[in-house]
Amino acid sequence: MAIYGIGTDVVQISRIAAVLERTGGRFAEKVLGPDELRVFHARRARSEARGIAFLATRFSAKEAFSKAIGLGMHWPMTWRALQTLNQRSGEPYVVASGELADWLAARGITARVTVSDERDYAVSFVVTETDAAPPPAPAPVSRTTS
């Protein structure tokens, strides 16, 4: 396996809370995939703060993943196409769907993710790996004078 890319993201949890309040909850529906949304609602029902922290970590993971694959938030990377779920052990993992899953499979890309949150911030780190041969290095830029 070779490293394809890395990405990290830090988000202020209060910013996520403000956007969630301003949008009446639509922000969570825009950003979270269906499995993430179920977990968000369950956690938020038990504790508003834990629900918002969950949303913040998932938002951060999507941002970090988009950086690790080198696309940013551009097709085929969309908010709902990538979900960060947890194993029974608590270990997070990512699941891609739709065109993003196809794009990743075509390049042999897999990912490892970690997320964490504290009172004020959520952070995530993603490493993407591939079995495929790396793309050729870009040609050096040369300057010509006339």
Swiss-Prot record:
EC number(s) per entry: 2.7.8.7
Enzyme class: transferase
A Pfam family reported for this protein in Swiss-Prot or TrEMBL: ACPS
UniProt keyword terms in alphabetical order: Cytoplasm, Fatty acid biosynthesis, Fatty acid metabolism, Lipid biosynthesis, Lipid metabolism, Magnesium, Metal-binding, Transferase
Chain positions recorded as Mg(2+) binding sites: 9, 63
Protein's UniProt name: Holo-[acyl-carrier-protein] synthase
Reactions this protein catalyses: apo-[ACP] + CoA = holo-[ACP] + adenosine 3',5'-bisphosphate + H(+)
Location in the cell: Cytoplasm
Cofactor: Mg(2+)
Function statement: Transfers the 4'-phosphopantetheine moiety from coenzyme A to a Ser of acyl-carrier-protein.
GO process terms (BP): fatty acid biosynthetic process
Principal location listed in the UniProt entry: cytoplasm
Family matches, as InterPro entries: 4-PPantetheinyl_Trfase_dom (IPR008278), 4-PPantetheinyl_Trfase_dom_sf (IPR037143), ACPS (IPR002582), Ppantetheine-prot_Trfase_dom (IPR004568)
One Gene Ontology term of the molecular function aspect: magnesium ion binding
Family: Belongs to the P-Pant transferase superfamily. AcpS family.
SUPFAM superfamilies tied to this protein: 4'-phosphopantetheinyl transferase
GO cellular component term, pick one: cytoplasm
